[in-house]
């Protein structure tokens, strides 16, 4: 960006930096052959970044010029941070520009603004159920990989963030169990819902979150009776939502592997959200997917579903998992021992989530949307199983309705629409021709109405529906 900015100062307003990739690959290609293999993609990404930064550079320079024009000796940290946060100006770039004008940067103020934003981001990312909850007891043992029902004891109950000894019907609370089959939200997979059945009460679990590492909080409402500390409960996960969520989670693993085959090995997962309704998958790629790429991705995923691979899970040391080719998510923190999920030879990933026993259970995979969420990050939303069938049937119903409106068959809708568009264009051309003809005939009559004003013929008249041309 500093190089681009210097080029900008020299009058180079078009992207230029990406052109160096060709020369770099010639000089360094023998030592780094992967650079030659990837040079087209590297150049494309660099060009895209240059084009984006050129836009922000122009707007950012206006802000910076406005601040520097105030005859100051020190640029305040808030302005420097705004340039960094909003326009992508690294602090050293702002410092370079200031140095040229004899102006220094308030580094301390910049760091304060940066620290404030980090704190706000941390606060926004905390689960709401964590607020005010202080727990110092034993951790929760998770049995949800093996079963959807398990007996446990409530170690703590929190009402409105405060620890209590019991709750009664109608109370909302967070219950901590020593053992549970409920999956707590993590890794992009939402927490389980279900119920806790005690001898004297029924607690409806709406969500499950980690209130600490290894401590599961079951958030919900006591529907009836009374729940007391140390009560033994039968924890029952809602099987329908768990199954649908597992379908979608396993589908994201297949999707990840398929995208790497279709688009290239540069594709890596950048985020996900998996619930009972759909799967959302963010990944690294610098361009929208074409219709053919989407179709090929869907074909590959559904082909694996038909293979009905057994989903295998194993725990092993992190280094061993990576040696076996397991995909690890960039930026994710892993322990020394990790859980590996394999789906035939098609997909192997590190994952702590819940999955189907065999991929055939997914049934059907259908991409609903593909969009961009940030520079170099694309997002796919997809549905599986019954939801995918419902989606296809809804689209089929829409097509039938359109065909009925156009008085044609579904197979000929595209041809019919093209015909209508062509007819409209022809009608517009004919209308223009008739207007021109009418104006010409009117013009001949109007010419006779011109008045002589001091030797100049003048005609003033109001024409309805006349083309200004």
Task: Please place each PLM-identified region on the residue numbering.
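A glycine- and charged-residue-rich anion-binding loop/surface
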Residues: 1-469
């Amino acid at each position: 960006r500093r190089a681009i900015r210097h080029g900008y100062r020299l009058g180079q307003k078009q992207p230029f930096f990406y052109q160096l990739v060709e020369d770099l690959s010639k000089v360094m290609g023998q030592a780094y052959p992967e650079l030659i293999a990837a040079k087209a993609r590297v150049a494309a990404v660099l060009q895209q970044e240059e084009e984006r930064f050129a836009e922000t550079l122009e707007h950012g320079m206006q802000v910076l010029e406005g601040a520097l024009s105030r005859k100051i000796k020190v640029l305040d940290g808030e302005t420097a941070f705004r340039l960094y946060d909003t326009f992508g100006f690294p602090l050293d770039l702002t410092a370079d520009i200031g140095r040229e004008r004899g102006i220094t940067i308030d580094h301390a103020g910049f760091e304060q603004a940066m620290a404030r934003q980090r704190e706000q981001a941390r606060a926004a990312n905390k689960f709401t159920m964590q607020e005010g909850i202080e727990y110092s007891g034993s951790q929760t043992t998770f049995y949800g990989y093996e079963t959807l029902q398990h007996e446990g004891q409530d170690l703590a109950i929190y009402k409105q963030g405060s620890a209590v000894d019991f709750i009664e019907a109608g109370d909302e609370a967070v219950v901590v169990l020593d053992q549970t089959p409920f999956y707590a939200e993590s890794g992009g997979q939402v927490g389980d819902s279900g119920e806790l059945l005690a001898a004297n009460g029924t607690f409806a679990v709406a969500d499950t979150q980690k209130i600490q590492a290894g401590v599961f909080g079951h958030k919900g409402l006591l529907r009836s009776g009374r729940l007391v500390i140390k009560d033994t409960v039968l924890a029952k996960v809602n099987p329908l939502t768990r199954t649908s969520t597992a379908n979608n989670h396993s589908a994201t693993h297949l999707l990840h592997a398929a995208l790497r085959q279709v688009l290239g090995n540069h594709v890596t997962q950048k985020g996900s959200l998996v619930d009972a309704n759909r799967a959302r998958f963010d990944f690294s790629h610098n361009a929208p997917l074409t219709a053919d790429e989407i179709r090929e991705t869907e074909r590959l995923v559904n082909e694996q579903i038909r293979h009905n691979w057994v989903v295998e899970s194993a725990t092993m040391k992190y280094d061993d998992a990576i040696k076996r080719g397991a995909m690890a998510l960039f930026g994710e923190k892993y322990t020394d021992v990790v859980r590996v999920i394999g789906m035939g030879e098609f997909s192997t990933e590190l994952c702590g989530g819940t999955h189907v026993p065999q991929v055939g259970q997914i049934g059907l995979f259908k991409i609903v949307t593909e969009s961009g969420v940030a520079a170099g990050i694309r997002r796919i939303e997809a549905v599986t199983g019954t939801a995918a069938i419902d989606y296809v049937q809804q689209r089929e119903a829409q097509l039938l309705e359109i065909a009925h409106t156009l008085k044609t068959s579904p197979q000929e809708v595209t041809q019919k629409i093209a015909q209508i568009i062509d007819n409209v264009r022809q009608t517009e051309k004919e209308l223009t021709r008739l207007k021109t003809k009418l104006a010409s005939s009117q013009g001949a009559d109007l010419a006779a109405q011109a008045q002589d004003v001091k030797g100049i013929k003048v005609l003033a008249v109001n024409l309805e529906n006349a083309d200004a041309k």
